[in-house]
A protein has these predicted regions:
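A conserved mid-protein helix/loop that constitutes part of the nucleotide-sugar donor-binding site
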Residues: 16-21, 190, 194-213, 233
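Glycosyltransferase donor-sugar binding loop
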Residues: 36-41, 195, 220-236
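Short hydrophobic beta-strand element within catalytic cores of glycosyltransferases
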Residues: 35, 293-295
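A short helix/loop element that forms part of the nucleotide-sugar donor recognition site in Leloir-type
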Residues: 167-185, 238-239
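Acidic donor-binding loop of glycosyltransferase active sites
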Residues: 250, 265-279, 292-293
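Short His-centered aromatic/hydrophobic patch
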Residues: 86-92, 113
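Active-site donor-binding acidic/aromatic loop of nucleotide-activated sugar
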Residues: 230-235, 248-257, 263
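A conserved, positively charged/aromatic
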Residues: 76, 100-137, 141, 148
């Protein structure tokens, strides 16, 4: 069986990590796996298990990206997928129009709702699928309330994590040496961690404010996660807040990391402080699988 997954980019993130995990599992079962995206740091992980990657500029919501409909159709004609799995709204629109004029046998379309999507019309593309996956009961209920979907085609499949990667095995001395060389300010401190991409609803301000009430001689906070180009102003405002509170020596932004499992293990507590309900907080189960306290 041939399966293609479609998403904007393969950078650090829960959706992206899930895409890699599924691709790896498909390959392990003997299926032919491929991913279409605008690339990113996780593409190399596809190579490790023999999956294909088709680079297509579908990350930005603009007319130029819509011009990729024909190119996507050509990829389908070449790869001949049995299943196309769409994981994001804009790529789902491109997929919808690409399949309309695809000659021959059309693939089964599966979509995964990874969030409580606003803009119902724009998000409607995710409902244009033969089978739909909701990653939690919250998301499942939201789909029923906002979209016209047949219940028999809507499947509740909770997200999980790879227990081969997220486990209680001890950290290697080599990794610890590299970590403390890069972040010496974290050594011999109670390490508090707020993982996730830099965005306003992740509770980063609350995490920063927490340090007003802590003995900073004992505690250090780290925030591992990528900063998108359109979030640079928000990121700058966070850095300003930290500076105003004289916390620059006690809070560290780590950027996008490929060693997040090790970061969970070196942490004393991993936080999830999202200011609105998360569809599914993947960082919580990942950290718990590593034996780290979660708050």
């Amino acid at each position: 069986m041939k399966v293609i997954q479609l998403l904007p980019e393969l950078k650090i993130g829960g959706v992206e990590r899930g895409t890699i995990d599924l691709s790896q599992h498909l390959s392990k079962l003997g299926h032919e796996s491929a991913v279409i995206s605008n690339g990113g740091s996780l593409v190399s992980l596809l190579d490790q298990h023999g999956a294909k990657h088709f680079n297509l500029p579908i990350a930005k919501k603009n007319l130029k990206a819509l011009s990729q409909i024909k190119n996507l159709r050509n990829i389908y004609a070449e790869f001949q997928p049995d299943i196309v799995h769409v994981r994001s709204r804009f790529p789902a629109w491109i997929n919808y129009y690409a399949l309309r004029k695809l000659k021959g046998k059309k693939p089964i379309v599966v979509s995964t709702f990874h969030g409580l999507y606003s803009k119902p019309f724009y998000s409607k593309s995710m409902s244009y699928a033969d089978e739909i996956i909701a990653i939690s009961k919250t998301v499942q209920n939201y789909i029923h309330q906002n979209y016209t979907v047949d219940s028999k085609n809507l499947h509740l499949i909770y997200r999980g994590c790879d227990l081969e990667e997220f486990n209680i095995n001890p950290l290697s001395d080599a990794w610890k040496d590299l970590w403390y060389k890069e972040f010496p300010q974290t050594k011999d401190k109670i390490l508090l961690t707020l993982p996730g991409r830099i965005t306003s609803w992740k509770g980063i301000e609350a995490f920063i404010n927490l340090f007003d009430h802590l003995d900073t001689a004992k505690f250090h906070g780290i925030i591992p996660g990528p900063v998108a180009q359109n979030k640079m102003n928000y990121f700058a405002s966070l850095e300003k807040l930290i500076k105003e509170k004289n916390l620059s020596d006690h809070l560290t932004f780590c950027g996008a990391r490929s060693d997040i499992a090790e970061i969970y293990k070196v942490s004393d507590i991993v936080f999830n402080l999202s200011s609105k309900p998360e569809p599914f907080g993947r960082t919580i189960i990942e950290a718990a699988a590593c034996g780290t306290h979660v708050m």
